Every structure is written in structure tokens, then in C-alpha cells.
């Protein structure tokens, strides 16, 4: 007989990456395979992510549900003895709204586990063979969003963050691209490279490399309003700087000669 996986005694929040099932972590894949109930954000996760689910598992879409409805289902299924997983696109710690769900579940004395996932900025950068941290250019990556209906802390305005001239990954910002471009051009040269990704790693997704001065125009032409990421970085296409890591004249713990 094959090995029978032990039922989880916790609810798992699982990051499933931006869309490609091959980018699932081994742990995420294992959790999906043993789940009795899979609660997933169908507006942000392609259905093929569920291809590895076991036969007979219950799959519940959440795009039309509010917080209380989602958590009520999770509690009900878990208390009925089911193995419950909650799927989130990308990595749950980034703009995932998991805190409020977890608080409700913990109030019911339910143990929680969070499984990290690959984020869209990593995949988009990989598609363009881009390194976002280059010595003497930038060693900092900022993951943020343009202010919209959800407020931003006063000290985290895009203008304040752009002053660092580091690599900036803009999530949830396609509707505010005009204002974002205007702000970024105050601190970055117009020719700064920008990776634009739409539904990154989905079957119909794509990425493009453009210049900052064209970010608004390009977004309008492509009718981008959601599921879009912008990576603005002075490091992209900058091949003039060399890392010390593999420099023969640089000594470190594992290479002292």
C-alpha cells in the first residue's frame, strides 16, 4: 500500500507563486495534494494550480466572498475534521491580507501555518535575466505600491522612497501609473529601465522591458489596470559593475587566497 499522509491539525496559508504550477514549492505542492478543502483566490490564481489536488477534494472560490464568509467556511470545515488549505497568489506576506484572517482563526484556537511562495517581482526579473542589486549602483530593493483607496503611511510615499534611487517594485499600481511615472521621473533618469509584467507566468501573461519615460504610455496602450507589476531599477542593463563575490583579488571566509 502507498503511504497515507497524516491529516494536518492546522490550517495552512500557502503561497502558490504568480501562476505557473512549476514555481510551486515542494511544501506547497505537498499541502495541496493532501488537502480535503482548498480555498483559493480564483481571481488571482489560475485553476491549473489545483491540478495536483486529490480526487474528491472540495475547491471553494473566494472572489465573491468577504472576510467573514471566508473565515466561517475555514472554521466550519476545519472543525468538521477536514484538512484545510488557503491558497494565496505570490507570497502571502506581500499584500496578502492574511493577518486579519489569521486573527479570526486564532480566536477560535486554530493553529496556523504559513508556507512562503515565489513573488511576481522575482519571476519578472528572472525572465529578463536581471539582477536588482549591483555594487555601487544599488544594493536595495523596495517592494511597495502607489497610494490609492488603501492609504499609505505618511513616510512611505512613493516620492520619499524614490529619493533612494534604488530598485523599486511597484505592485497594485497600474491604475495610478501617470502619477507614479511623474513622481519617479523626479529622481530617476527618463531612460531608466522598467520591467512591466502582466499576469506574470500565466499562460496569457507577458513581460516587457521599457524606459521609465514610456511607462504611462505603454500601460495605456496595453490597457493595464490590474495584475501588473513594475520594476524600476538603475541596476537593470547595467553591466559596468562587478561584484566582489567572484573577484579573484577579493578575500572572504571561503576564499582567503
Segments predicted by a language model, with ranges:
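Class I S-adenosyl-L-methionine
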Residues: 2-115, 123, 216, 228
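Short secondary-structure boundary/capping segments
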Residues: 4-5, 29, 51, 76, ...
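A contiguous loop/helix-start segment that scaffolds small-molecule binding in enzyme catalytic cores
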Residues: 11-13, 69, 80-84, 140, ...
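Class I SAM-dependent methyltransferase SAM-binding "motif I" and its flanking Rossmann-like core
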Residues: 20, 91-164, 208-211
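Residues at the C-termini of beta-strands that transition into short coil/loop
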Residues: 42, 63, 116-118, 147, ...
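Short phosphate-engaging motifs
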Residues: 45, 120, 176
